[in-house]
């Protein structure tokens, strides 16, 4: 039993609040345990120069932690005059994860900006950002679809993310900060509803791990990703019915 009372294969409570802010086409507050992230999706009727004239859209992400989202104050990137490596890595991960879910040709020449602001961090901020941002993305795309229906609905499948790790000798799902801090192995896994992998980021923090342990962690991640997708479906309700249909 973990310090929180959770079983090793149990995720933290998930709460997804849609339409959390007024102006963004999609906005979500996602809470996974004590980790809280505001995710917004904003639409621009243009694409980066390398996509002009291609007929394809683009999705890109920015990630930020509020200064007191952590136990001690974290300096804003803007005050350091550069984006730190961790922030850059995470926002690229979020962008890749969401682009994998979308038919860019069906989206057309539009850019969807995903902004993830961590309000409170207690482990799993990148995976929480991906899970919440997907819901914000669906809301933004649905608003486009209501204004002018797509010939083919562009979102192809659900995407969620979850962390897994080895703490002591136990393989556990959805690590909080206390667990992440002492984990021998720490892994972030992004998956589709069909059980396909989009990205696997794994590190042996305290030494190597075996292929058997890797397989066990991935099996655990698949269980967690399904639970996260169910939370997305519960939040979206009937607004998710177009996903994966490719219908006109």
From Swiss-Prot:
Catalytic activity: tRNA(n+1) + phosphate = tRNA(n) + a ribonucleoside 5'-diphosphate
EC number: 2.7.7.56
InterPro entries according to UniProt: ExoRNase_PH_dom1 (IPR001247), ExoRNase_PH_dom2 (IPR015847), ExoRNase_PH_dom2_sf (IPR036345), PNPase/RNase_PH_dom_sf (IPR027408), Ribosomal_Su5_D2-typ_SF (IPR020568), RNase_PH (IPR050080), RNase_PH_bac-type (IPR002381), RNase_PH_CS (IPR018336)
Any Pfam family matching the protein: RNase_PH
Function: Phosphorolytic 3'-5' exoribonuclease that plays an important role in tRNA 3'-end maturation. Removes nucleotide residues following the 3'-CCA terminus of tRNAs; can also add nucleotides to the ends of RNA molecules by using nucleoside diphosphates as substrates, but this may not be physiologically important. Probably plays a role in initiation of 16S rRNA degradation (leading to ribosome degradation) during starvation.
Subunit annotation: Homohexameric ring arranged as a trimer of dimers.
Name this protein carries in UniProt: Ribonuclease PH
Species this protein is from: Clostridium perfringens (strain 13 / Type A)
């Amino acid at each position: 039993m973990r310090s929180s009372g959770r079983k090793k294969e149990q995720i933290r409570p998930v709460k997804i609040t849609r339409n959390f802010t007024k102006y963004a086409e999609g906005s979500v507050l996602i809470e996974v345990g004590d980790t809280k992230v505001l995710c917004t999706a904003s639409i621009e009727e243009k694409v980066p120069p390398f996509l002009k004239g291609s007929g394809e859209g683009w999705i890109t992400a920015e990630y930020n932690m509020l200064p007191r989202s952590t136990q001690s104050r974290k300096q804003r990137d803007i005050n350091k005059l550069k984006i730190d490596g961790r922030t850059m890595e995470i926002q690229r991960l979020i962008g890749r994860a969401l682009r994998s879910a979308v038919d860019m040709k069906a989206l057309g020449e539009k850019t969807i900006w995903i902004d993830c602001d961590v309000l409170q961090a207690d482990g799993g901020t990148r995976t929480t950002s991906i899970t919440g941002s997907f819901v914000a993305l669906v809301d933004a795309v649905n608003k486009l679809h209501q204004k002018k229906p797509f010939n083919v609905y562009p979102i192809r499948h659900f995407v969620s993310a979850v962390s897994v790790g080895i703490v002591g000798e136990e393989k556990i799902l959805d690590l909080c900060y206390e667990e992440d801090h002492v984990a021998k192995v720490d892994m972030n896994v992004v998956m589709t509803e069909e059980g396909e992998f989009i990205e696997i980021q794994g590190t042996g923090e305290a030494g190597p791990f075996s292929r058997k342990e890797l397989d066990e962690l991935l099996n655990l991640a698949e269980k967690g990703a399904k639970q996260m997708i169910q939370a997305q479906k519960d939040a979206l309700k009937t607004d998710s019915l177009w996903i994966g249909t490719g219908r006109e």
